[in-house]
């Protein structure tokens, strides 16, 4: 299937944007999302994730990944029925990628792919914070996609 994944990388960050796109595409394919959907993923810094977390979630601390799903219910904009469905935006802290990769004992590439997969699943409605059953389901989907990418635990 064909999807549009836009990856924006802040200046001075040495990021494998192709890996981010591949991980996002793998989630969309695994979840059988209809072709033509679009998503934007920004790779940025702890400072920017801290600001976004504070401004949008009221949490005054940095975090590793944030997902902003487009619920399609905005009355401010008119959308044509033939336009691709916009799933939303994801922001990932590359600073957290490096720290967490070292903490968990795996490569920054695996951590970057994992946070991309995690954020994509949130865009699609998965939420590990709803309870143990939802957490188990989301973790299983994450592991399935990571295995398909050749990056299992």
Swiss-Prot record:
GO terms for molecular function: metalloendopeptidase activity; RNA endonuclease activity; zinc ion binding. Binds 1 zinc ion. One of its GO terms (cellular component) is cytoplasm. Signal peptide: none annotated. It comes from the Bacteria. Pfam families: YbeY. Zn(2+) binds at residues 118, 122, 128. PROSITE patterns: UPF0054. It is an enzyme of class 3 (hydrolase). Its cofactor is Zn(2+). Its main location: cytoplasm. One of its GO terms (biological process) is rRNA processing. It is found in: Cytoplasm. Keywords: Cytoplasm, Endonuclease, Hydrolase, Metal-binding, Nuclease, Ribosome biogenesis, rRNA processing, Zinc. Its EC number is 3.1.-.-. Disulfide bonds: none annotated. HAMAP family: Endoribonucl_YbeY (MF_00009). Belongs to the endoribonuclease YbeY family. Single strand-specific metallo-endoribonuclease involved in late-stage 70S ribosome quality control and in maturation of the 3' terminus of the 16S rRNA. PANTHER family: ENDORIBONUCLEASE YBEY, CHLOROPLASTIC. This is Endoribonuclease YbeY. It comes from Chloroflexus aggregans (strain MD-66 / DSM 9485).
